C-alpha cells in the first residue's frame, strides 16, 4: 500500500548465511504505467498450490523444470499455435493481478474464457516479438516452482492478425516497447499448472 493508491509487486530475495544478498523487485503502479493494456485493479488471491509439496513421482529435476519454463517463453514468443511446453488441464495464469485464463470477464482480450493451452494453440500472443534475457534464479524441485525473469519485447508493427481458428483480431499493443517481468511457474508432473506474472 503506497500513500496514494495500492500497487502490485513481485519480490525476489537471495539469502546467504542468513543475510540478504540480492533483492529484485517489480512494481506495477496501474495509474502511472503507459496504457498499452488497461489493467483492472489487481485482485490478490492466495494460491496454496504454490506451497504444496509434490509427491516424488510428480517432481522433475532442476534442469527439466527450467526447460519447461523456458519452453513457455518459446511458446509465447511470436506465438503461432505451436507449443514448446506442456500445460496441465487445470492451468491458470494471473497477469498483474488479473486472472487471464478461464475468465470470460477479462475485457482486454478475446480469449480470456479459454485455458492456457487453448489460448496458445490459437496463436493469440503473436504480438510478443521476443522473450529475451531470460533468467531462472529460483527453482524448487519439491514444490515444482520456477521463478523466471526477463523482457517481453513488442515491435508494435502488428495491426490485425489471424488466429489459427480463422478469426481476425486487433493487436492490443500498437507501439514498440518492452515489459520487464518476474514470472512464477508451478509445474506438476512435467506440466505447467499455475502461472503468476508481474510485469511493467
Give, region by region, the residue ranges found by the protein language model.
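C-terminal and inter-domain tail/linker signature
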Residues: 1-200
